[in-house]
């Protein structure tokens, strides 16, 4: 699994011009799922998302607090393109997990993130 983590003051996901999910202060996380990812990868990436220190701690220390420390929101977006390979001028996604397998895997990831954090603070691209 790959997670691209971005600290945000607000973020949203729009589909056909309509906002389907949004957050205030927190993290926007793009999630890529590789063909051979397993449950242990989910636990690892959840731990990293929750504990990586990307916020000021309030005492003047930069990079001193995690999203869990601050009780901020998390917006997750499934992004299979994180596992692309550039072949000449063409993108190849053979390393990404196929859609029929990745959808339940992604839902399991969201369930684990909600279980380890505050469920109502975890949003996804379908909320």
Language-model regions, residue ranges each:
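A short acidic, glycine-rich active-site loop
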Residues: 98-104
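Short glycine-enriched, charge-decorated loop/helix-capping segments at active-site entrances
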Residues: 91-96
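N-terminal, polar/charged subdomain of small-to-medium soluble alpha/beta proteins
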Residues: 1-90, 104-127
